[in-house]
């Protein structure tokens, strides 16, 4: 190709587009992407977990001896049954390595799963020592309306690193 061909091609192109004016672009607003069902369910679950569990609430719990709590109106025999290990937990939640916000969500999900599966007893492992979760989990459990009682787990279910939790399923016959 030489310069004459370039000039000739350019002239031909100019002749072809002569009289054409650019299209005026109107602004197009695209919808924000729709949230998936999982995102919506997770957000709803977080909202419910935050409404049940407050970090500032300080219930009266035992300082010495095994960690235990019994809701008003629940027979004290239930606490004794939990202590002896008469109830076998159907679901187990291990909170080792979780942050507080994640642990709250998992705890709320565990209680919801117990209700859904008609499981009266579950085990929550929070770990040994005097860590944050060991202090917070009993305080959160006291606040949930579906929790009837909890007691430090027997050795076979984690001992002082875990709690056996009794869930209120309504008027169902007791399962052991």
Swiss-Prot record:
<dbReference type="GO" id="GO:0072344">
    <property type="term" value="P:rescue of stalled ribosome"/>
</dbReference>
<keyword id="KW-0255">Endonuclease</keyword>
<dbReference type="InterPro" id="IPR022990">
    <property type="entry name" value="SmrB-like"/>
</dbReference>
<comment type="function">
    <text>Acts as a ribosome collision sensor. Detects stalled/collided disomes (pairs of ribosomes where the leading ribosome is stalled and a second ribosome has collided with it) and endonucleolytically cleaves mRNA at the 5' boundary of the stalled ribosome. Stalled/collided disomes form a new interface (primarily via the 30S subunits) that binds SmrB. Cleaved mRNA becomes available for tmRNA ligation, leading to ribosomal subunit dissociation and rescue of stalled ribosomes.</text>
</comment>
<keyword id="KW-0540">Nuclease</keyword>
<keyword id="KW-0378">Hydrolase</keyword>
<keyword id="KW-0699">rRNA-binding</keyword>
<dbReference type="GO" id="GO:0019843">
    <property type="term" value="F:rRNA binding"/>
</dbReference>
<dbReference type="Pfam" id="PF01713">
    <property type="entry name" value="Smr"/>
</dbReference>
<dbReference type="GO" id="GO:0004521">
    <property type="term" value="F:RNA endonuclease activity"/>
</dbReference>
<dbReference type="InterPro" id="IPR036063">
    <property type="entry name" value="Smr_dom_sf"/>
</dbReference>
<dbReference type="InterPro" id="IPR002625">
    <property type="entry name" value="Smr_dom"/>
</dbReference>
<protein>
    <recommendedName>
        <fullName>Ribosome rescue factor SmrB</fullName>
        <ecNumber>3.1.-.-</ecNumber>
    </recommendedName>
</protein>
<keyword id="KW-0694">RNA-binding</keyword>
<feature type="domain" description="Smr">
    <location>
        <begin position="93"/>
        <end position="168"/>
    </location>
</feature>
<comment type="similarity">
    <text>Belongs to the SmrB family.</text>
</comment>
<comment type="subunit">
    <text>Associates with collided ribosomes, but not with correctly translating polysomes.</text>
</comment>
